[in-house]
Amino acid sequence: MESQASENGSQTSSGVTDDYSSWYIEEPLGAEEVQPEGVNPLCQPTVPPALHHACLASLSLLALLLLALLVRRRRLWPHCAHCRPGLPSPVDFLAGNRSWTVPTAVFVALFSNLCLLLPDENPLPFLNRTAASSPDGEPETSRGPWKLLALLYYPALYYPLAACATAGHRAAYLLGTVLSWVHVSVQVWQRAECPQDPKIYKHYSLLASLPLLLSLGFLSLWYPVQVVQSIRHRTGAGSQGLQTSYSEKYLRALLCPKKLDSCSHPASKRSLLSRAWAFSQHSIYTPEPGFCLPLKLVISATLTGTATYQVALLLLVSVVPTVQKVRAGITTDVSYLLAGFGIVLSEDRQEVVELVKHHLWAVEACYISALVLSCSLTFLLLIRSLRTHRANLKALHRGAALDLGPPLQSTHPSRQAIVCWMSFSAYQTAFSCLGLLVQQVIFFLGTTILAFLVFVPLLHGRNLLLLRSLESTWPFWLTLVLAVILQNIAANWVFLESHHGYPELTNRRMLCVATFLLFPINMLVGAIMAIWRVLLSSLYNTVHLGQMDLSLLPQRAASLDPGYHTYRNFLRIEASQSHPGVIAFCALLLHVPSPQPQPPLAPQDSLRPAAEEEGMQLLQTKDLMAKGAGPKGSRSRARWGLAYTLLHNPSLQAFRKAALTSAKANGTQP
């Protein structure tokens, strides 16, 4: 019996053990963890990113040293450092004859890499930093200092890639080909090996790297083309004639303007299509022959478009997939959750589920609509601002004074102006990012309020809060509307009278009586107008937050707006240091043979006062008589504009012979 009992006990214990072991069959074994549903496991590439970046950094440093041997510092120290290597310039911002494609592509690649730093745990990939964990399991070290170092690392990484284009040497183009191919190969390899990333969204890393891949792909094609062209032409100095092509085109377009076709056809005889085209030309930016935007403005516009894409992508993938998952996981338990807050949508639980899903779908639709509206407004204002930039630069080139707030004290470069010019593109990109973010928040709140107070209640026939509030307060609103309508009718028919075709104030006694009696009601109307003023100004400033060519403050306080202040000083440097007319005349002077010695003339380094006054009258942009003077008047104004520019341009005044200590006026030597 004892043996049988022990046998039964062993069987029972083993059976219980078997039963208990079956309970933990789904539990993780050892240190393994179960990935949540819908989350992809972290990709482990065959070649770690640390090795990729170590190779890229070494190759970039080697390329920079080779470029330093090619580029000599003859411009700074022509005698004492004739054979010493110098640091090549990555971008020549003030040269209007340079191609804008390579600097723009490099800046897009740099900005895209900085955007990819946002979800990255290792900002510096070649430093595999494992953060020490605290007893609570949280990392003790912060990634902030490493991300600050990454902000300096990536510009240094792409520095040689941009400098190879400015060197203008066949070996530099070949070096740029190798660098661009290595960069694009590393990026394509990483995206092909790990197309999905569990951070933020599985496809976010791939979608955010599209501008990076496009810019590097363009550079990998541009540099080989330059190598082939340099081998075919067998010369590297043949670009000197091309350097002044833009300046010559500018002078031709300025001195020989073509008659517009719209002037020969009256406005009444033009078709609807031509009117629409003329309106689009006046409202948005269209290329104009003979004028090119400065390189900084082109880079800023491209970075604004890239920033809009990156911010919109981040806003989209960080919210919409989460809302979709929440909507798909709603069950009947949500009715109990809402009942706990005192919200009873329906007695039927299944109907509550459908209503909640429909409301979440409405929230998602409002969010996407607000994002589309924000991106559309950003692009439209960007195109419009390019036209404003061109108009302001053309006016400054011809010596006109712009209504850009308080007048500048001097047109000469200053410390503040140089700092503003250096930071213009960076400010424009940051303003665009923040402006799109603020627009998204404001538009999302507005569309959500409109949807849940108007459209959703009307569709479902319940929760008509807005209509109920209007039903209870309709006497108040009717009184205000009638007061405004009656005042307008009385102002038009009672208090105004025409005498000999001129309106004149009449019935002054009745006017004073009506003003006194309607004072309380007008005070209520004023409160409504004050709320409308706040909303309108907030909406206006939100829409134009990304524009630096427009002050968000009144004209008297325009200098307090940091963005507008930066824009004014940027125009000041661009108009004085990279004037195409000045560049063209300097190029002509360099190519003109030295003249025969002439007898010394009377000192004269400027126009006669009467002649300069006559020229300034021609330069007045608001003179209607000068505008209607025809082609001869426009040609005269253009010539006087060039003369005024060559006399007063700050980049030339310091180098004219009258300003030198060892020379007399008009170039006469002692």
Curated annotation (Swiss-Prot):
Keywords: Cell membrane, Glycoprotein, Membrane, Phosphoprotein, Receptor, Retinol-binding, Transmembrane, Transmembrane helix, Transport, Vitamin A. Disulfide bonds: none annotated. Residues 235-294 are annotated as: Interaction with RBP1. Residues 511-548 dip into the membrane without crossing it. Phosphorylated on tyrosine residues in response to RBP4 binding. Phosphorylation requires the presence of LRAT, suggesting it may be triggered by the uptake of retinol that is then metabolized within the cell to retinoids that function as signaling molecules. The modification Phosphotyrosine is found at Y644. GO terms for cellular component: plasma membrane. It comes from the Eukaryota. It is found in: Cell membrane. One of its GO terms (molecular function) is retinal binding. Pfam families: RBP_receptor (PF14752). Residues 1-50, 120-144, 190-205, 318-368, 445-474 are extracellular. One of its GO terms (biological process) is female genitalia development. Residues 72-98, 166-168, 227-296, 390-423, 496-510, 549-670 are cytoplasmic. Glycans are attached at N8. It is a multi-pass membrane protein. The chain crosses the membrane at residues 51-71, 99-119, 145-165, 169-189, 206-226, 297-317, 369-389, 424-444, 475-495. Homodimer. Interacts with JAK2 and STAT5. Interacts (via extracellular domains) with RBP4. Interacts (via cytoplasmic domains) with RBP1. Functions as a retinol transporter. Accepts all-trans retinol from the extracellular retinol-binding protein RBP4, facilitates retinol transport across the cell membrane, and then transfers retinol to the cytoplasmic retinol-binding protein RBP1. Retinol uptake is enhanced by LRAT, an enzyme that converts retinol to all-trans retinyl esters, the storage forms of vitamin A. Contrary to predictions, contains nine transmembrane helices, with an extracellular N-terminus and a cytoplasmic C-terminus. Besides, contains one long helix that dips into the membrane and then runs more or less parallel to the membrane surface. This is Receptor for retinol uptake STRA6. The gene is Stra6.
